[in-house]
């Protein structure tokens, strides 16, 4: 049985994520930014407008978790 190096596994994983993101993100952004919020109440509309900011905060938290985990190794 062939043992795969951790670096190769990480490189393949990053490659797969980039390919999936390149295919799925344009459609997701199109659906999010073209959604009609005219019939929604003001509270839901406000949360919808904050969605990009909440996404950025989530990504930053993910990177902090990853960096702390990598620092412990």
Swiss-Prot record:
Question: Which keywords does this Swiss-Prot/TrEMBL entry list?
Answer: Lipoprotein, Virion
What modifications does the entry list under PTM / processing? Probable lipoprotein. Lipid modification may enable hydrophobic interactions leading to the flexible nature of the virion. The protein probably exists in 2 forms, a lipid-modified one and an unmodified or less extensively modified one.
For the region Hydrophobic, give the residue spans. Answer: 9-29, 47-67
Q: Name one GO cellular component term.
A: virion component
Q: Where in the cell?
A: Virion
An additional note in the Swiss-Prot or TrEMBL entry is: The virion does not contain any lipid membrane.
- Return the protein name: Major capsid protein
**Species name for this entry?**
His1 virus (isolate Australia/Victoria) (His1V)
